């Protein structure tokens, strides 16, 4: 063979002359990376029996460089302590590159099958091997791919090695976290037991005192937190009653604002029965879609009026509380009545009878309703 190499010709060679070794191959560290994805061989098949002699991948090198070899990679997996063989994988390298860069074309080597295109030069190519940061190429061939060959997609050796290392690091981190959490739990348990024993003895540690002070401070801050609704710069009809006198926002009780007794008006949302009263009020959507609406101009504004009618159960306790608030501004308050009763006790029985407010002065609002329901008509012009 000349130093410049000769062109490959398969014309006079028998297809049975395919040199190989009976060895299962050898482990080689830092194997150069192939330009191409590997081929996974069907279990039980023989690569050298199925591989065409011109089975060179397309896409790299010129006509003279279409020569090289397929290198075997044996694989296995440990299952319950037993080694389980996996299908072989074969990687392609150009002549003069890869793990057998010093080998000559057709040398008999362990796990090596030589291939070349007709007319290729049987001398080392200068194509080198793939860099670790470059992605492997998909396998493409001129001829038909044997059925025993499975062409892998982006399963290069470095990716496989990277995934294996990543899984190993992940397992190590997981085990480390597990041990750390276990140790932390043990430490916490011991600490809690010691603190509990000290507490029984009436001894408080600095940490417990700090926690107690911190909780007290939090409770103090929560008590002073301002929950007053922000009603400034809002229209009257957009304001929200807070704790305290509602006349600041809605004015004194009158024929156009006739809901609420003196206690409710003075205390707003903090009044005793406010939550129950609020439950008897229609929802926004009910008012919006279930009311009769009218509008008219009022200077530089538009006055909107709506009439809404709905029913409350007559015998429900909340209904009675609600009805007592209608036009309550025109009736004596409970506070005023109680004050009068106290004054009357210091006076004569005759004077007391004259000053006690007769029950007939308290309007009865239930006589206008039927036996089962309360019908209400609200008219809002604000």
Swiss-Prot record:
Residues 31-153 form the CoV N NTD domain. Its main location: virion. The keyword Transcription regulation applies. The modification Phosphoserine is found at residues 9, 156, 254, 256. Pfam families: CoV_nucleocap. Residues 231-334 are annotated as: Dimerization. Residues 33-159 are annotated as: RNA-binding. Residues 154-163 have a biased composition (Low complexity). CDD domains: CoV_N-CTD, CoV_N-NTD. It comes from the Viruses. InterPro entries: N_prot_C_CoV, N_prot_N_CoV, NCAP_aCoV, Nucleocap_CoV, Nucleocapsid_C, Nucleocapsid_N. Residues 164-176 have a biased composition (Basic residues). Packages the positive strand viral genome RNA into a helical ribonucleocapsid (RNP) and plays a fundamental role during virion assembly through its interactions with the viral genome and membrane protein M. Plays an important role in enhancing the efficiency of subgenomic viral RNA transcription as well as viral replication. Belongs to the alphacoronavirus nucleocapsid protein family. Homooligomer. Both monomeric and oligomeric forms interact with RNA. Interacts with protein M. Interacts with NSP3; this interaction serves to tether the genome to the newly translated replicase-transcriptase complex at a very early stage of infection. This is Nucleoprotein.
